[in-house]
Curated annotation (Swiss-Prot):
GO terms for biological process: cell chemotaxis; defense response to bacterium. Its main location: secreted. It is found in: Secreted. This is Beta-defensin 14.
Length: 67
């Protein structure tokens, strides 16, 4: 039974990101951008696209074709 507690602690430590490392939130943002029919643009959206969100805090934008 103690082994279960130890494995649980290692699982929690593995999933909690280190300070400055946003792997899990960044991946989730990209995933939700794709679900909404968008793509992650590096700097700006193209002329025929609109911004519907953000893919990261560093400036990547989630863009989708205008309706």
């Amino acid at each position: 039974m103690r082994l279960h507690y130890l494995l649980f602690v290692f699982l929690i430590l593995f999933l909690v990101p280190a300070p400055g490392d946003a792997f899990l939130p960044k991946t989730l943002r990209k995933f939700f951008c794709r679900i909404r029919g968008g793509r992650c643009a590096v700097l700006n959206c193209l002329g025929k696209e609109e911004q519907i969100g953000r893919c990261s805090n560093s400036g990547r934008k989630c863009c989708r074709k205008k309706k």
